[in-house]
């Protein structure tokens, strides 16, 4: 069994696969491509892990990773917009219909690339995710992506040193197994319900669209932080 974590090569964050074996060698059942984290073959739609199983087993792990980052950064987490569960068709072809979950975009402050590396190793080792990163920009920012290409799950992190970083995750289009009833009637938990104990706040001002500073975790009132804004901290994100 392998686990996807953040590792380091030449001083730069990369996503790697740590091989859990006695001597650290690639198992015979694993190809070199798999060991290097290259894309897996896509599973036929009907054979993918169901959306219900994703919501029960996979999404809580990803939310736990976001929680751990927020706790490392002081206990607050911003969000924009709300999480969604929508009907989808496989690759938009209209051939097979299923359901797609997308988390809200979540914002955390005061975390470093080393924090992300360490927390990913602790929280995400049980997921079959493999990943890539963009080249590091001059300001040290990175885009990190990891996913289960066989079933369509993906997580994306926009890391900005010294400012707030953002992440979101989604399931990809998956079949329903019916175990949670009619999904048209299913109500997703709110961000506050997903992250009890954290200070949850809207990431942007409703009127101006400007980034909101994280509230004080002691009072719940808006705080002052030079890590809450900046022209680049939402690069690549849907507004």
Predicted regions and their residues:
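C-terminal motif of bacterial Sec signal peptides marking the signal peptidase cleavage site
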Residues: 19-22
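Residue-level signal for mature regions of secreted extracellular proteins and peptides
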Residues: 16, 81-82, 166
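Short secondary-structure junctions
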Residues: 69-85, 126-136
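Short, intrinsically disordered, charge-biased short linear motifs at domain edges
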Residues: 8-11, 71-78, 111-113, 155-164
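Long, charged/polar, surface-exposed segments that mediate recognition or autoinhibition
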Residues: 96-143
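An acidic-aromatic pocket/loop used at catalytic or ligand-binding sites
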Residues: 2-6, 24-68, 133-239
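A glycine-rich, hydrophobic loop/mini-helix early in the fold
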Residues: 73-104
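N-terminal export and membrane-targeting signals
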Residues: 1-16
């Amino acid at each position: 069994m392998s686990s996807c974590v953040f590792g380091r090569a030449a001083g730069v964050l990369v996503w790697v696969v740590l091989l859990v074996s006695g001597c650290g060698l690639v198992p015979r059942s694993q190809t070199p491509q798999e060991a290097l984290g290259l894309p897996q073959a896509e599973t036929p739609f009907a054979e993918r892990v169901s959306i219900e199983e994703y919501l029960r087993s996979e999404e809580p792990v990803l939310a736990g990773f976001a929680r751990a980052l927020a706790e490392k950064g002081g206990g607050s987490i911003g969000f924009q917009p709300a999480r969604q569960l929508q009907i989808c068709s496989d690759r938009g072809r209209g051939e097979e219909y299923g359901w797609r979950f997308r988390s809200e975009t979540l914002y955390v402050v005061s975390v470093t690339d080393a924090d992300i590396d360490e927390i990913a190793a602790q929280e995400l080792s049980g997921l079959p995710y493999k990943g890539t990163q963009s080249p590091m920009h001059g300001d040290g920012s990175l885009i990190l992506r990891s996913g289960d290409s066989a079933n369509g799950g993906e997580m994306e992190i926009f890391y900005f040193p010294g400012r707030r970083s953002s992440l979101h995750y989604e399931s990809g289009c998956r079949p329903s197994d019916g175990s949670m009833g009619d999904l048209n009637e299913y109500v997703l938990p709110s961000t506050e319900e997903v992250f009890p104990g954290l200070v949850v706040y809207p990431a942007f001002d409703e009127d101006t669209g400007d980034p909101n500073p994280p509230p004080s975790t002691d009072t719940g009132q808006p705080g002052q932080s030079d890590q809450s804004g900046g022209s680049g901290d939402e690069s690549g994100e849907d507004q």
